[in-house]
Amino acid sequence: NGVVKFEGTSLMNGGDGLLHSADGAFNKFTFGTYIYISEWVDGAFLFKKMDGNSTIIAFQMGATANSLKLSIGSSVATVTTPDLATGWHYIGLTYEQGTAKLYVDTNNTAINFVGALPNEIPNTRTDFLIGDKFKGYLDETFVSSLVVGTSGRNPITFDNWNNSKILAYWKYDDATKPGKD
């Protein structure tokens, strides 16, 4: 029913509990969303967790259209995607013990990121920010503690067992409560 619009000057705060656990560092997760890019902006963040100027984890747009990068600590991996610059697309970023993959639309064949990443995400409690510098729209954004790729997309659904593994899910359907999950 709704989407969230970013115009490059605002962001959404998902709270400081995402990708952080009292049980220890995360070594796998999925970030998924439907995305419509109005303008490709080098360095725009789909999401980030920063501690001051230090990157905990960040997923952002690259210098050229259809290039994306994932940063964990000081390590960076990149991927070139099919045409994300036009129309609506589903993207699913999966990370498991240093291996990052990107799923686009209904293609169950992942695109592998190039570059070495650590086996775990630093377990730092800091805000999970969505959309910083991003120009476009997001719909049905989620974070899961499982590697799910394109499972359950269109619309995004989760079976009963997977419900307990969803860390956050924003449908953006309530205009009176933006960012409600």
Report the location of each language-model feature:
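Extracellular glycan-recognition modules
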Residues: T9-K69, T99-A100, S145-G152, S164, ...
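Extended recognition patches within non-cytosolic domains
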Residues: N1-V3, T109, V114, Y137-D181
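Flexible glycan-contacting loops in extracellular carbohydrate-active proteins
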Residues: N112-Y137
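Extracellular glycan-interaction surfaces
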Residues: N1-S10, F31-V41, I56-E120
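Short sequence motifs at beta-strands and strand-loop junctions characteristic
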Residues: A25, P82-A85, K135
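Short structured motifs
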Residues: M12-L19, S74-V79, L129
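Short hydrophobic/aromatic patches on beta-strands that form ligand-binding or substrate-lining surfaces
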Residues: T30-E39, F47, I91-L93, I130, ...
